[in-house]
Structures are given as C-alpha cells and as structure tokens.
C-alpha cells in the first residue's frame, strides 16, 4: 500500500485538485472556485495528507488545530476533516493508511483529542474513534412549537416583536431587559466574538475561534446560500453589552393554499444566559410570513 499509493502533504498549488476528491467521494457538486479560495483561509497545508496514484490525488485527509472545551477544562485537539477516497480507489487500504498516519501526527503534536463529524460513524470505530455526542436537526412549523413556560417567561411578553421594535422582553444574567437588534454579521463581528468567547469555556464540545475562523464563518459566498438569503444576524443584549446572537437565512415560499409559508434556517445561535436565548428563539419562531424554522448544530 505505502509504495503503491504514497502519502504526503500537498502544496498550495495542488489545493484545487485536492478539493475535487471529497466532492466526488461525497457525491457533491463541483467545489466552486470561490469555495476553494475561502477554504484556503483556514486550511493548514502542513496537516494535509494526500494519497497519490501516480500524479493523481486519490485520497485526502486533513486536520485543523483547535482548542476544545471538555468537561473540566480546555485541551488541544485535532479537528479531522477532508477525509475521502475516490470511488475508483475504495477498498485498497488507502483510508486505513491515512488514518494511521494522521493519528500518529496528532499524538506527536501533543493533542489530547482527535475529533470529527462523521458521515458514517461505523467507519471510524476501526481506528479508535467513539461517539462523543449526537447531532439533532430540528424543524418547527409555525404554531406547532412553544418554549417551556419557565423559559418563555424569561423572554417576556414583548420579545416576539423585538426585531422590529428594537426592544425585547425579559431580564437575566445581564440584569436588564433583553433588547434585539437586527443587522449583518460583518457589522456585528466584535459583539458576536464577545458572546462566543464567553460561551466557549462553559460548554463542552465548543472550539475556540481565531480571526481566520471568524472570517470563514462570516464570509457569505453564493454557493453557501443554497437558494436562501444572505446570512443575517439577530443580536440580543442590554446596557451592559451583548448577551446572545443568531445567524440565520430566510427564503420566501407559499403554501398550496396561497398563504405565505417561508423558510428560516438558523445556522448558529449562542447566548450567555437563558433570558437572551429565550428572547432569540421566541423572535425567530414567531416571524411573520415564516412557516417553518430549522436548525442543526451550533444551537
């Protein structure tokens, strides 16, 4: 295996060809040029692994250097990504060779954890991985969901109109009424980071973000929208500063009855206290013209 499909890191000039392999392996559309350039912002070329068949890249794996919150503290972690093998080269030991190579590198770097989001979790048990958490995708149709009474009480009676009026409902850790402000993520970058950095140390599974990762998250190229709107931001706070935020997208739609039934996708919702969280959720779940709100991860 090692002689037939040698492994090595890629150079920046090889990144385009490298990105084509996971696109084919995951049956995805072609990796757009703007996506390749955006990924370069965070990609760590010295942590890349490519398996070659002659001059062609046939397998890929990579890792990001993270600080990961676990119960009891924060540890260095390798965020495993880009794991793929071309359909034409499956079952030839390429994946196993890349995994062994990568795990040895993670250990040599002194990282305590190797973590990844698995498309097929059963694959990775062979290499020592185990399930650390589960992923929930949630869709709430308008009128079919509600916050628990105790949580809804934190949001206050007026939070449902907070985005329009600039005022929210309840109070919480900040000590004052929660107010909502609608805006664009890039304009609120400082406030978003303040909330996120406050949450990270207290929530296992969270990964600290540096400037590169904020740039990657807030970039809004067309291919990420998937037919929905620009990424929008809803900020919750009081006189003491920001206490929460939601990043989301919308898409107008109409039901068979001719009534509005738009979609709202929550990409990330973070809050430092229950009142701010409840105020954000209440606003997003009661938007006019929205028939269903969905979320997955990072909420």
Where are these regions (language model features)?
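Conserved catalytic-core motifs of GNAT/GCN5-like acyltransferases
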Residues: 117, 130-148
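Acetyl-CoA-dependent GNAT
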Residues: 44-47, 52-73, 81, 248-254
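An N-terminus-focused feature that recognizes amino-terminal "leader" regions
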Residues: 32-38
């Amino acid at each position: 295996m090692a002689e037939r499909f040698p492994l090595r890191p890629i150079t920046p000039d090889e990144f385009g060809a490298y990105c084509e392999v996971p696109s084919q392996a995951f049956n995805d559309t072609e990796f757009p040029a703007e996506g390749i350039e955006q990924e370069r912002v965070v990609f760590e070329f010295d942590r890349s692994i490519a398996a070659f068949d002659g001059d062609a890249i046939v397998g890929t794996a990579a890792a990001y250097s993270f600080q990961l919150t676990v119960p009891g503290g924060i540890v260095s972690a390798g965020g495993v990504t880009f794991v793929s093998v071309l359909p034409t080269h499956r079952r030839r030991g390429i994946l196993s060779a890349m995994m062994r190579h990568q795990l040895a590198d993670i250990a040599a770097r002194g990282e305590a954890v190797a973590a990844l989001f698995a498309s097929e979790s059963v694959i990775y048990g062979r290499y020592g991985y185990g399930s650390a958490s589960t992923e929930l995708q949630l869709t709430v149709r308008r009128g079919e969901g509600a916050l628990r009474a105790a949580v809804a009480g934190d949001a206050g009676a007026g939070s449902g109109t907070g985005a329009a009026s600039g005022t929210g409902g309840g109070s919480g850790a900040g000590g004052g009424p929660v107010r909502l402000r609608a805006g664009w993520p890039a304009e609120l970058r400082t406030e978003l980071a303040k909330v996120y950095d406050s949450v990270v140390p207290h929530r296992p599974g969270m990964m600290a973000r540096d400037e590169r990762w904020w740039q990657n998250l807030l970039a809004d190229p067309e291919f990420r929208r998937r037919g929905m709107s620009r990424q929008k931001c809803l900020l919750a706070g009081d006189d003491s500063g920001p206490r929460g935020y939601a990043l989301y997208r919308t898409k107008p739609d109409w039901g068979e009855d001719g009534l509005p039934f738009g979609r709202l996708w929550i990409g990330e919702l973070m809050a430092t206290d229950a009142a701010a969280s409840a105020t954000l959720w209440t606003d997003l779940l009661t938007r006019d013209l929205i028939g269903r709100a969905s979320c997955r991860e990072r909420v």
